[in-house]
Amino acid sequence: MKLYKKWSSIWQSKQLFLLPSMAGVFLFAVLPFGNMLIQSFSGGLTNYKAVLGNEAFHLAVKNTCRFVGVGIPLLLLLSFAAALGIYKSKWMRFLKSVYLLPMAVPTAVVVLIWKVFFHKAGIANQILAFFHIGAIDWMSTDAAFAVLVISYIWKNLGYTIILWIAGMAAIPDSIMEAARVDGATQGQCVRYMVLPQLKPVFYTITMLSFLNSFKVFREAYLVAGAYPQKSIYLLQHLFNNWFTNLEIDKMSSAAVLLAVFFALCSLSMKNLWEKEDVY
């Protein structure tokens, strides 16, 4: 009887329902990361020295940081402006659906669209020719970086707008009405009433945008291949090339460095957000 009660209490425990998920995390995340960590130290610090002294690694890190530094602020700014523009408008539901369409388009189709649009004889150069501007070889010059940023913003703008709108919908109308009664302008309402209320949403969007910025490799790879124009040679290209050449030790060391960088960025943003929230 006691044994039955013991097993019955275990079965009814809420923690039991976490076991399948925790088992999945352990098998497909913790164990592979542990194996990768061991692999990275297979030659002591030799692999880390080789990675940190690799010129291709320096170029990939520089381009990735540049992409993140340009793409995320532009995405946040444009999506917030668009969310403000359509919030509570009669077209809001329709526009929300339109903005989400790029997320439903498969990557292969997106790549085909960009190839047609930015081809030497494509739509972009025809538009430039209409204004008597010379054609640009988009994917073989530094203009490829702009194409990649545009692709990233176009793909991620929709869900970011939806998140901003969801945050705005949670702000009580009474706060905005009280501010307007006190004579606050639209700009002052946005700056002093809306933005402070959207800090949690800002943190969520920034983290999601940061993570999604590392998924743009698919477009860059399918458009320009494993060795693209140097301005869009990202960390993912480097990892892919090392994997192709079976340089697993280097790849493991670089992955550990990247994981540490991700963790530091996430913790820094979280601490900054919590500190501002306290004050």
What role is predicted for each listed range?
Residues 1-4:
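N-terminal hydrophobic targeting signals that begin at the initiator methionine
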Residues 6-279:
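A structural signal for multi-pass alpha-helical bundles of membrane permease subunits
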